[in-house]
Swiss-Prot record:
Comp. bias intervals (Basic and acidic residues): 182-202
Quaternary structure (record): Component of the WAVE1 complex composed of ABI2, CYFIP1 or CYFIP2, BRK1, NCKAP1 and WASF1/WAVE1. Within the complex, a heterodimer containing NCKAP1 and CYFIP1 interacts with a heterotrimer formed by WAVE1, ABI2 and BRK1. CYFIP2 binds to activated RAC1 which causes the complex to dissociate, releasing activated WASF1. The complex can also be activated by NCK1. Binds actin and the Arp2/3 complex. Interacts with BAIAP2. Interacts with SHANK3; the interaction mediates the association of SHANK3 with the WAVE1 complex. Interacts with ABI1 (via N-terminus).
Pfam families, per database record: WH2
Tissue: Expressed in hippocampal neurons (at protein level).
Subcellular location, record wording: Cytoplasm, Cytoskeleton; Synapse; Cell junction, Focal adhesion
Keywords: Actin-binding, Cell junction, Cytoplasm, Cytoskeleton, Methylation, Phosphoprotein, Synapse
Transmembrane segment boundaries: none
Organism listed in the record: Rattus norvegicus (Rat)
InterPro entries xrefs: SCAR/WAVE_fam, WH2_dom
Regions of compositional bias (Pro residues) in chain numbering: 322-332, 347-374, 384-399, 423-437, 458-477
Protein origin, superkingdom: Eukaryota
Designated name of the protein: Actin-binding protein WASF1
Length: 559
């Protein structure tokens, strides 16, 4: 419905009702018509004055804008004409310190406001009937809303439009985030290699020489793989086996020097396991104890020196494990093949007689067994048998942490009695771990190549070659002299000042988060009825969405 800005009254000059009792009606109508014409002329002159006043105001504002634009052009022309090319145009400091350009012009918005209401419309508005005085009830409302807005609300349509615009902008942002999350969650598909076209020319070429000379497709494929990846090594194609009987020609003492060195070189690359058995589980450590799996070797030089180099030295009987022991870990990097081979060149001592078989389990439970000693095995033994476990006399303490897999230990040169007595006492054993960790294997574990920082290996004098194998004693049966000592903590004590400082830092971080949240809320509250801000934000979101959609379309097209 159009709004009538100016209404000229009276519209009908002669359409009037004549009063009763008038004798000369023609004269009365003429006078009334002339009066209405005069009223129309006065109304027209008044509106003409309003129109010319508005034109004058518009011309004045236009002149002001033109003058301000002319001043800006003059300043720019002076700066352009008087620019010295020898001087530095713009320093880096000016670029970083200068703020971004922001226009000072105010965009025209909220055109239909009470302040911009024309005078004729204001007069028409004043003629209208007044609404009921509901504003008197506004101070008594708890929700803070104006009472008159329930009867008439001029800003209702603008608020409805503003809510719709902001909701559309937020929906577009949510859709954009959802699309990005979907692209991140989507797994990276491998590049699809196009299938080569089927060509029967190669088959006909193979059959042209005769079916006898035609090569098998599997052989061709194997050749292509060898050409692409290189020939496979011998130890990779050879199946891994487990030797159950090491007597006779399988004994290490009966091997020649060349075969023995070959076996030692392969020991770093291959681990023998019994077939049809799964590999042992990895060692379990305490939570947070991330350390590499320790590799262990006990007196590897003694293993090589105790082996005779000539096969004529005789065959040594070998004790073989009746139960499948876990495989040993690979040799450490510090023990190279060259050092092993160099140690083989030394003069070997006379062969050591084999140890006696392990005693019966009933005889291996002494009243107070000695501390665990390294397991001693004769040359040629690959996997020792785990000795039986002595029954605990008292309630066992928390189980010891599970150590690395069982390693092959070999005898070392026994020390003279004087040297054994002159050695310092061994340090105390490592402290027990918290309960819940799996107990260690009954077989004595060799020295660790990379022990953790919290544990200290306990070196003990090696017994003679004829010493019987003794089972390790449970943790509860260890002598009182070897109880773990309580070392004082080396961690620095946090003083009250440091705790106060940490608390202040935490509070500062929390305050910073609260301030950032308030700034975001203030930005949202700053919108209010700014039409230009709402429209610019909507345009920016739509523009970014259009760019993202084009990128997604390109990705889908490439796929």
């Amino acid at each position: 419905m159009p709004l009538v800005k100016r209404n000229i009254d009276p519209r009908h000059l002669c359409h009037t009702a004549l009063p009763r009792g008038i004798k000369n009606e023609l004269e009365c109508v003429t006078n009334i018509s002339l009066a209405n014409i005069i009223r129309q002329l006065s109304s027209l002159s008044k509106y003409a004055e309003d129109i010319f006043g508005e034109l004058f105001n518009e011309a004045h504002s236009f002149s002001f804008r033109v003058n301000s634009l002319q001043e800006r052009v003059d300043r720019l022309s002076v700066s352009v004409t008087q620019l010295d090319p020898k001087e530095e145009e713009l320093s880096l400091q000016d670029i970083t310190m200068r703020k971004a350009f922001r226009s000072s012009t105010i965009q025209d918005q909220q055109l239909f406001d009470r302040k911009t209401l024309p005078i004729p419309l204001q007069e028409t508005y004043d003629v209208c009937e007044q609404p009921p005085p509901l504003n008197v009830l506004t101070p008594y409302r708890d929700d803070g809303k104006e009472g008159l807005k329930f009867y008439t609300n001029p800003s209702y349509f603008f608020d409805l439009w503003k809510e719709k615009m902001l909701q559309d902008t937020e929906d577009k942002r949510k859709e954009k985030r959802k699309q990005k999350q979907k692209n991140l969650d989507r797994p990276h598909e491998p590049e699809k290699v196009p299938r080569a076209p089927h060509d029967r020319r190669r088959e006909w070429q193979k059959l042209a020489q005769g079916p006898e000379l035609a090569e098998d497709d599997a052989d061709l494929l194997h050749k292509h793989i060898e050409v692409a990846n290189g020939p496979a090594s011998h130890f990779e194609t050879r199946p891994q086996t487990y030797v159950d009987h090491m007597d006779g020609s399988y004994s290490l003492s009966a091997l020649p020097f060349s075969q023995m060195s070959e076996l030692l070189s392969r020991a770093e690359e291959r681990v023998l396991v019994r077939p049809h058995e799964p590999p042992p589980p990895p060692p379990m450590h305490a939570a947070g104890d991330a350390r590499p799996t320790p590799t262990c070797v006990s007196s590897a030089a003694g293993l090589i020196e105790n082996r005779p180099q000539s096969p004529a030295a005789g065959r040594t009987p070998v004790f073989v494990s009746p139960t499948p022991p876990p495989p040993p870990p690979p040799l450490p990097s510090a023990l190279s093949t060259s050092s092993l081979r160099a140690s083989m060149t030394s003069t070997p001592p006379p062969p050591v007689p084999p140890p006696p078989p392990p005693p019966a389990p009933a005889l291996q439970a002494p009243a107070v067994p000695p501390p665990p000693a390294p397991l001693q095995i004769a040359p040629g033994v690959l996997h020792p048998a785990p000795p039986p476990i002595a029954p605990p006399l008292v309630q066992p303490s928390p189980p010891v942490a599970r150590a690395a897999p069982v390693c092959e230990t070999v005898p070392v040169h026994p020390l003279p009695q004087g040297e054994v007595q002159g050695l310092p006492p061994p340090p105390p054993p490592p402290p027990l771990p918290p309960p819940g960790i799996r107990p260690s294997s009954p077989v004595t574990v060799a020295a660790l190549a990379h022990p953790p920082s919290g544990l200290h290996p306990t070196p003990s004098p090696a017994p003679g070659p004829h010493a019987p194998l003794m089972p390790p004693s449970p943790p509860s049966q260890v002598l009182p002299a070897s109880e773990p000592k309580r070392h004082p903590s080396t961690l620095p004590v946090i003083s009250d000042a440091r705790s106060v400082l940490l608390e202040a830092i935490r509070k500062g971080i929390q305050l910073r988060k609260v301030e950032e949240q308030r700034e975001q809320e203030a930005k949202h509250e700053r919108i209010e009825n700014d039409v230009a801000t709402i429209l610019s934000r909507r345009i920016a979101v739509e523009y970014s969405d259009s760019e993202d959609d084009s990128e997604f379309d390109e990705v889908d097209w490439l796929e």
